[in-house]
Amino acid sequence: MESLRAHRLLALVRGKDPAAALRTVTTLAEEGIAAVEVSLTTTDALTVIERARAELGPDALIGAGTVRTPADAARAVDAGASCLVTPAVVDGLAGIGVPVLMGALTPTEIERALALGGAAIKLFPASLGGPDYLSALRSPFPDGRFVHVDIVPAPGSPCSPRTAGPSGSTAVRTARACRGMT
């Protein structure tokens, strides 16, 4: 979590070509993007994580995203993931050995994610509430660490959600912790 907080950017890699996904992860690292999340929806995602870990070393922040079950989490950690990102609240991840950014949107989901040991709450989809919603959440959850997640496409980029094709493209998104990073 400290590394993510320091770098303020988490690149998301998702696609159907595992070789391209691995090249994307290593290229991002070479270009100074210190934290990369490989979505488990990527074809052969665990192999991509494993190979990226072998190429980039033990200090690289390589996360597994779209973790939906404890079995997903265990396989991702075994492959070398140094953090997990879930799209929703997932039971059974306490004690997994790596930080978990747990997806939540409503106060009920946030309370549950915190009770389950989420290192941070991935406010997703953050665009539904915006800054006012986040400010409102800070009142009942003053100790909660929130990660605001949005897609940040370049104009005309294949990363744009409007132009991302079914072949699977690389998307880059920011993960800005809204507590302790601003």
State where each predicted segment sits.
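A cross-domain feature marking catalytic cores of carbohydrate-active enzymes
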Residues: 13, 38-40, 64-66, 88, ...
